[in-house]
Amino acid sequence: KVKTEILFIERCLALLRPGGRLGIVLPEGIFNNPSLAYVREFCEDRAFIKAVVSLPQETFNSAGATVKASLLFVQKFSDEEAADYRTKQAAARAEIDAKYQPIIDAERERLQTEIDPARKLKNLDRVKEVQLELRKYERQMAELKAREARQLLKERFPYPIFLYEAEHVGITGTGQQDSCELY
C-alpha cells in the first residue's frame, strides 16, 4: 500500500512541465525517513531538489494537524537536463557493473561448483541451501551496486540543495500571527 503523499508527489512531478517548479508541504517523515529513500530517489531522478525547509512542530496545530511538516521545492529537469542525467546515470551503472562483474561471476562459479556435486548425490537440502546462499549474495550485490552507482551519479551530476530548519513561520500553534523568517 502506497501512502497518499507519495502518490501525490509522483502525480505532481508527472504533471509538471519540463523546467517547471513545484513547492509542496509534506509530512517530515516522507523526505527524511531512511525507509522511504526511494521517494527521494524518485524525485532526484526527475527534478532538481532546490530546497527542503523543516517547519516547527506547531505550524499546523491551529488547523488540527499534529504532524511535523516540511516544504519541498523542486524544479523538473528540462528535456536536455533529463537526457544528460539519464546518460550519466547509465554510465555510472555501467561502470559499477563492470567493477563488480568479475567478483560476482567468481562467486557464482564457486557456488555452482558446490551445487553440481550435491545434485549428483541427490542431496536436495544442500542444493537448496547453496541456491539460497546464491540468491542472497546476488541480492546483496545488486543493492551494493545500486548504492554505489547512485553515489557516483551524485558526484557526476552535482547541484546544491538548500536545507533549513525554520523556527518562526508567521503563525503560532494557536493560529495567531508571528514573525516569519521564510522570506
Regions found by a protein language model. Name each.
Residues K1-Y183:
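A conserved structural/catalytic subdomain of Rossmann-like adenosyl-cofactor enzymes
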